[in-house]
């Protein structure tokens, strides 16, 4: 812990400044590149939902447009409507799969805002009471209680049982 009650995660900077695949990683995931781990749980013609490879909590999802967009203001009216419906549906899946007590939902647009990927993506982060444990405080690390690949598997199964529909959203 640093001055003023701040926690420092020095590994985050090495990730931000480290080696990344050439090109947009979300476009590579969209195109099923063998160079990226496929953690997608759902896709349609406009959006893809995937488990975050570096989740804050189990069930941390990224919802992003199929086409490469870097600013929320670039979304079409059709994409905005679909985004809202997909977000609502995904929150329902997460409620059933993870039983969180709340959510953080938002964008990081631009490097100054914390975005390490240019492709616009909405974070859906399940939150739980007392989720910061002693290991987090002492080691300055998060303890992942579930492998993101397992989270993706569980959510894919649930999504197959309860398919997305614009009429239900």
Which positions does each model-derived feature cover?
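HIT superfamily nucleotide-processing domains
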Residues: 1-169
